[in-house]
């Protein structure tokens, strides 16, 4: 039971620190507009999946952002290792979170329906 709370606290801490690292340490323009939306960590604390969103709808921007994050993964992981007080820093993987774009698309459709009435 205590392990579950530890994982939750670690997920929140990783999310906060990765946001800070992306803002202050990573200078790659491809990751300039990235927002971290969530983190999931495995039960053994060995792997972390970081979910991110970008405001652009273009597929090319998504690919560039994914490439920029892949290139910055080593820096982000080493910074996390120095900031977190855990035995081993988890392996990081980044996955795009499309829920923000989905939500904005739903809002757009609702607004279009309101205008038609």
From Swiss-Prot:
Keyword Zinc in record: no
InterPro entries: KH_dom-like_a/b, RbfA, RbfA_dom_sf, Ribosome-bd_factorA_CS
GO-annotated molecular function: ribosomal small subunit binding
A Pfam family reported for this protein in Swiss-Prot or TrEMBL: RBFA
HAMAP family listed in its UniProt record: RbfA
PANTHER family named among the record's database cross-references: RIBOSOME-BINDING FACTOR A, CHLOROPLASTIC-RELATED
UniProt family annotation: Belongs to the RbfA family.
Gene3D superfamilies documented for this protein: 3.30.300.20
Protein name: Ribosome-binding factor A
Taxon lineage: Bacteria, Bacillati, Bacillota, Bacilli, Lactobacillales
Organism: Lactiplantibacillus plantarum (strain ATCC BAA-793 / NCIMB 8826 / WCFS1)
């Amino acid at each position: 039971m205590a392990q579950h709370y530890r994982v939750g606290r670690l997920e929140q801490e990783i999310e906060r620190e990765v946001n800070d690292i992306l803002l202050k340490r990573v200078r790659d323009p491809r990751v300039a507009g990235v927002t971290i939306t969530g983190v999931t960590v495995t039960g053994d604390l060995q792997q972390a999946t970081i979910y991110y969103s970008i405001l652009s709808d273009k597929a090319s921007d998504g690919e560039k952002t994914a490439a920029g994050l892949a290139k910055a993964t080593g820096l982000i992981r080493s910074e996390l290792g120095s900031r977190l007080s855990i035995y081993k820093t988890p392996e990081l993987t980044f996955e795009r979170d499309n829920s923000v774009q989905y939500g904005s698309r739903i809002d757009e459709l609702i607004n279009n329906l309101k205008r038609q009435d």
